[in-house]
Design a protein with these regions (language model features):
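Acidic, polar-rich low-complexity tracts and alpha-helical solenoid repeat scaffolds
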Residues: 1-10, 18-152
Length: 152
């Protein structure tokens, strides 16, 4: 009886380990597709969330979906998706991307008061997005007719 129970436990544990490898590899695959902006990436990201609904990468995948929506000009959808992302669950490299694309989607919807704090926070960081954040923060001030801050 103990031997049978031991075998069953071993099988279950090996299955769990294999499943963990599957969701990690699937994430790496969709992440590479996203980085290359391959056709069909959006569908693959959405399918990943369906296949692995409790993955630790769900916020990263949601971020990618929001970025793609922003790049396609679907700003309202992008904002909706990006607002659901828990920033604390993102990798350190992904956080500046979240700030930038969230702010940019707001600007495109003329929601400057929502966009401005995101760009101001991003200005404090040294990332690829920092020069853009400086410009868009000034633009937000300008659109709100705060010309003194816009020129700073």
């Amino acid at each position: 009886m103990k031997k049978t129970l031991f075998i069953i436990v071993c099988i279950i544990l090996s299955s769990v380990a294999a499943l963990a490898q599957d969701y990690r590899q699937a994430f790496v695959d969709v992440q590479q597709e996203f980085e290359q902006r391959l056709p069909g990436t959006l569908g693959h990201l959405q399918q990943y969330l369906k296949d692995y609904p409790y993955t630790t990468y769900s916020d990263e995948v949601q971020l990618m979906i929001g970025v793609l929506a922003t790049e396609k000009g679907n700003y309202k959808q992008a904002s909706k998706v990006l607002e659901q992302v828990a920033r604390k669950n993102l990798s350190r490299q992904a956080v500046p991307m979240w700030y930038f694309y969230s702010g940019y989607a707001y600007i495109q919807q003329q929601e400057y008061k929502k966009a401005l704090p995101l760009f101001l926070e991003l200005k404090k960081q040294q990332t690829l997005y920092t020069p853009h954040a400086k410009y868009y923060a000034g633009y937000c001030y300008y659109c709100q007719q705060d010309f003194a801050h816009a020129m700073a």
